[in-house]
Amino acid sequence: AQLSLSNVSDEMGTKFLQKSLVAVVFALVLILAYIAYRFKNIGGLTGGMMAVLALLNDLMVVFGTFVLLRAPLDGNFIAAMLTILGYSINDTVVVYDRIRENRGLLGKKASFEELVNHSVNQSARRTIITTVTTVMALGVMCIVSKLYGLDSIFTFAFPLMMGMLSGVYTSLCVSTSAWVAWSERKNAKKN
């Protein structure tokens, strides 16, 4: 005999959501600290803040997908959120690492905007191919889960797929563009 509970009281659901949010906030703080430290030579704190803002966008996409699917905010929800944090920050770190490498190669010959643009162009192909490969696997999971009525798999794979698509966009376009805009604004205030 297998015991299964699928209904959760409002109080339990609220506690779970609170604990989930604490886990996500904790992960975001650690990510900010990591980026600030690892990329301190090229303005890591600002880059970290922009990366966290981009991650928040990705998390909102995952949350919105759960809402549109009317899926319960359960273990699949927090697993999808934390997985997207990992995938998206990995893509962002690859781009930031390329920015750091190119700063060492180009020195001050290129403006920060040119440096970031060059670095994004260099890492875009790798980031897009990695994401497309993973999204294809998630797409297969979605199709199979729908064919066999595996709702728990679908409510994990589909939001994850949407979050990954958002993540590739935010890693290549949002975090880097915001970093450039913030840096230019900061430099304009100095002058």
Residue ranges and their predicted role:
Residues 1-191:
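A structural signal for conserved, well-ordered secondary-structure elements
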